[in-house]
Regions:
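Conserved mid-core segment of classical short-chain dehydrogenase/reductases
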Residues: 90-108, 127, 131-137, 157-160
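Conserved glycine-rich Rossmann-like NAD(P)H-binding loop of the short-chain dehydrogenase/reductase
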Residues: 28-45
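The beta1-alpha1 cofactor-binding region of Rossmann-like NAD(H)/NADP(H)-dependent oxidoreductases
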Residues: 39-40, 56-68, 104
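Catalytic Tyr-X3-Lys loop
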Residues: 89, 100-120, 144, 161, ...
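Canonical Rossmann dinucleotide-binding motif of NAD(H)/NADP(H)-dependent dehydrogenases/reductases
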Residues: 2-33
Length: 181
């Protein structure tokens, strides 16, 4: 996909891989919505990136919050051409540790953000992309999911993280096949 003049949402965009991705897209002439819960860092990055960037305070696991980020991209830049899913958390906790069994709430939180949040963003972004006109190459959009080697080779204390990233890996191909057809 041609990056110049295309509109992208980068989740987890205020730090780490997400911030690096947002900077790279902006450097190539893309317009970027930095979607993240960290308002201070997100606003600072959007300001750094200039007029072609916006910040959306976004909880990827919330339908309303995710939809607001998609709506911002469409209203600010006229459409949506790409989504890069970088949002995620890694909370290390053993299945059975010194303090007892792994907290179910911790496991659920990691799955909710890393897996369900990724799915949530994909479904909403895909719908927005489907409303746009194809570019000169016939493309309507692109979605990039980030996973981890932990999906295939998780380590001690990574049950929740490995399961969440394994889920991202597992859903990416069937969704890609569906959206490509």
């Amino acid at each position: 996909m041609q990056i110049r003049d295309s509109v992208f949402i980068v989740t987890g965009g205020a730090s780490g891989l997400g911030a690096g991705t947002a900077r790279a897209l902006a450097a190539q002439g893309g317009r970027v919505v930095v979607a993240d819960l960290n308002k201070a860092a997100g606003e600072a990055l959007a300001k750094e990136l200039g007029a072609g960037a916006r910040f959306a305070e976004c909880d990827v696991s919330s339908e309303a919050s995710a939809k607001a980020a998609v709506d911002l991209a469409v209203s600010a830049f006229g459409g949506l051409n790409g989504l890069v899913n970088c949002a995620g958390i890694a909370i290390g906790e053993k299945t059975l540790g010194k303090e007892g069994p792994h907290q179910l709430a911790t496991f659920a939180r990691v799955i909710n953000i890393n897996l369900i949040g990724t799915f949530n963003m994909i479904r909403l972004a895909a719908e927005a992309m489907s409303r746009g006109q194809p570019n000169a190459a016939g493309e309507r959009g692109v979605i990039v999911n980030t996973a981890s080697v932990a999906a295939f080779d998780g380590q001690i204390g990574q049950a929740a993280y490995a399961a969440s990233k394994g889920g991202v890996v597992g859903m990416t191909l069937p969704m890609a096949r569906e959206l490509a057809s």
